[in-house]
Amino acid sequence: MVPQTRYARSGKVHIAYQVTGEGPLDLVFVPGWVSHVELSWEEPTYASFLRRLASFSRLITFDKRGTGLSDRVPDDQLPTLEERMDDLRAVMDAVDSQRAAVFGVSEGGNLSMLFAATYPARTVALVTAGSFAKRV
């Protein structure tokens, strides 16, 4: 079953998000460059991955601004990492998550690192996959 999609406000932009699972840990999954919270559940392997994460946590997923079901942005105003970090914070606020483990994949890992450094009190743990802190 696909979780209900809701929207958080981040500045003037609406950010699509979903919450599934009832575990004791809030886990925010930060996707890579492209995502779609509803279509993710249609790909069997990816859906299995999300279900596994939700089996031990309250899993919070979202589409970054300009992707998936979140509001579009003009091509000449692509979002900065800081704006996308604010989107992550807005989603956490919308679901009343005071502290969460943040799991970022690819570009989502860079975003997760920035969030953890900016909001250490709101970050229980940081997990990254396929990410880098500095391009060399």
Positions of PLM-derived features:
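Short, hydrophobic/aromatic-rich segments at coil-to-beta transitions
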Residues: 1-6
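Conserved acidic catalytic loop of the alpha/beta-hydrolase fold
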Residues: 82-100
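Conserved HGGG/HGGXW glycine-rich cap/lid loop of the alpha/beta-hydrolase fold
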Residues: 7-71
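Short, glycine/charged-enriched secondary-structure capping and boundary segments
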Residues: 42-45, 74-77, 116-117
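Conserved hydrolase catalytic core segment
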Residues: 98-136
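Active-site phosphate/pyrophosphate- and oxyanion-stabilizing loops and adjacent acidic/basic residues
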Residues: 47, 51, 89, 113
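Catalytic nucleophile-loop/oxyanion-hole region of alpha/beta-hydrolase
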Residues: 71-85
